[in-house]
Design a protein with these regions (language model features):
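Short alpha-helix
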Residues: 187-210
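A short SAM/SAH-binding and catalytic strip from SAM-dependent methyltransferases
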Residues: 113-126
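Class I SAM-dependent methyltransferase SAM/SAH-binding core
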Residues: 49-51, 55-103
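Acceptor-substrate binding/catalytic loop of class I
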Residues: 147, 151, 181-195
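A short glycine-rich, Lys/Arg-flanked "PGG" loop and its adjoining helix->strand segment in the class I
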Residues: 127-142
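A short acidic, Gly/Pro-enriched loop at the edge of an enzyme's catalytic core
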Residues: 105-114
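Conserved class I S-adenosyl-L-methionine
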Residues: 2-44, 57, 61, 78-81, 142-176, ...
């Protein structure tokens, strides 16, 4: 029987080429990436950890902005791509195959900031991941993460959605979207907003700013076409908190 870590890694190992084609390397292609980087603020000289770093898109942007970056992921396949990019265009990034939910993860390490762009939805053990973040973050250090907005379903079956249409907001757990996108291939963990917030509180992380980035113009047009009589709800949710 596969462990939780092996299951999570296999989801992305099996779709590497598809994932790389869809996501690419440009941070400007995704609304949440810009918001996440803005909330992290000036990272020059900071030591920053990128959790669920994948092929290194956010890690490389952080390094370009002057951070000393370590990226962790459980998919060795995606890390191989990140390392290959680093060899071809060195930015001083260290990539590690680490289970961020383990109580032994990154033992003895300390970071000024931690970023996680959409990765929490892929991690089955939310509490374990946040516990690790709180443990490695220095006092007053920043943790910024982005997720699909947990409060609203997608406007149709093909839309990004934190939870399956028809199942209900309170039905937490892993689910597989019925569309050809990434979440239709690797699935996603849905949690209520209170689950996210209470997990932060439990690990002494205090929220000091949130953002709900506007969707891309293409997404907005699709929202309006599907829901012409209602104001389209937000799609994304980005949170910054600090260790106290």
């Amino acid at each position: 029987m596969m462990s939780s870590m092996q299951r999570e890694a296999a989801r992305y190992d099996l779709i590497r080429d598809f994932y790389l084609d869809v996501v690419g390397m440009e941070v400007g292609r995704e609304p949440t990436a810009a918001a996440l980087l803005d909330l992290l603020g000036d990272v020059r000289g900071m030591r920053v950890l990128d959790v669920a770093c994948g092929h290194g898109r956010i890690a490389r942007e952080l390094a370009r902005r002057g951070a000393r970056v370590a990226g962790v992921d459980i998919s060795e396949v995606l890390l191989d791509r990140a390392r290959a990019t680093e060899i071809g265009d060195p930015l001083g990034i260290t990539y590690l195959n680490v289970d961020a939910t383990s109580s032994r993860a990154l033992a003895g390490e300390t970071f000024d900031g931690v970023a996680c762009n959409h990765g929490l939805a892929d991690i089955d053990d939310l509490d374990g991941a946040v516990a690790t973040v709180a443990r490695v973050l220095r006092p007053d250090g920043r943790f910024v993460f982005s997720i699909l907005h947990p409060c609203f379903p997608g406007w149709d079956e093909d839309a990004p959605s934190s939870w399956p249409r028809g199942e209900g907001y309170y039905a937490e757990g892993w689910w597989l979207a019925r569309n050809p996108g990434i979440r239709g291939k690797v699935g996603s963990n849905h949690r209520t907003l209170s689950t996210y917030l209470n997990t932060l509180v439990r690990h002494h992380l205090t929220i000091d700013e949130v953002a709900e980035p506007a969707p891309t113009p293409r997404m907005r047009a699709r929202q309006l076409a599907a829901q012409p009589d209602a104001g389209p709800p937000p799609v994304f949710f980005v949170v910054r908190c600090r260790r106290v």
